[in-house]
Regions:
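Short acidic active-site motifs
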Residues: 5, 54, 76-77, 97-98, ...
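Glycine/Thr-rich beta-alpha phosphate-binding loop at enzyme active sites
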Residues: 39-44, 82-87, 103-105, 115-144, ...
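Glycine-rich phosphate-binding active-site loops on the catalytic face of alpha/beta enzymes
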Residues: 88-101, 131-140, 173-197
Length: 212
């Protein structure tokens, strides 16, 4: 899939579930549960045991799922993830060399940033979308709206503090998509609960887009 198509898919679905798990098997079960709810995008964090293997398995067995590598802190890790099937790369922080590595492979990169200076620096370095993290620590949707006022040209995906209760507020504030963690994909939850959560979030995004 071309880079532009990946970004278009991320924006269309409007959600990036942040997958954390205690084992590769649990991660694969959660990934299937998310997809069953209609959300065919997910971010496999490097904190998952055997994360690279999980990405490889998903790439081989679930071509319907858009696979992202999360919590990527350096270019070497980014390269490993890309070679094993990651179609976009996400980080909680800004590493210019990681951005450059993703450019080398023509892969969308979503580095983390929080302050206006960090966000602009990430954008100028070539970030396709900036992950505003942790959004909740700075006031949530109100903070995102404040950022978007002077920086409408920078696409942002808030992560941290996104919930069913706040999702619409973040979309109203101008979010490119929503990064959602345990509120959607709690590793302790039953798969059917995760599927129901995915459906719930997808309904919120679709309802918002229909009214916009």
């Amino acid at each position: 899939m071309q880079k532009s198509a990946i970004l278009a898919a991320l924006k269309k679905i409007g959600l990036v579930p942040v997958l954390r798990a205690d084992s590769p098997e649990q991660a694969l079960t959660l990934a299937s549960a998310i997809a069953a709810g209609g959300v065919t995008v997910l971010e496999v964090t490097m904190t998952v045991p055997g994360a690279i293997r999980v990405m490889r398995t998903l790439a081989e067995q679930r071509p319907d799922i858009l696979i992202g590598a999360g919590t990527v802190l350096d270019p070497e890790t980014a390269r490993m993830c890309i070679l094993e099937g990651a179609q976009f790369v996400v980080s909680p922080a800004l590493n210019i060399r990681t951005i450059e590595m993703c450019h080398r492979y023509t892969i969308p990169v979503l580095p983390g940033a929080l302050t206006p200076t960090e966000i602009v620096t990430a954008w100028q370095a070539g970030a396709d979308v900036v992950k505003v993290f942790p959004a909740s620590a700075m006031g949530g949707a109100k903070y995102l709206k404040t950022l978007k006022a002077p920086l409408p040209q920078i696409e942002m995906i808030p992560t941290g503090g996104v919930s069913v209760a706040t999702a619409r507020d973040f979309l109203d504030a101008g979010a490119f998509a929503l990064g959602v963690g345990a509120d959607l994909v709690d590793p302790r939850a039953a798969p059917e609960t995760v599927t129901a959560n995915a459906k719930k979030y997808l309904e919120i995004v679709r309802a918002y887009r229909a009214e916009a």
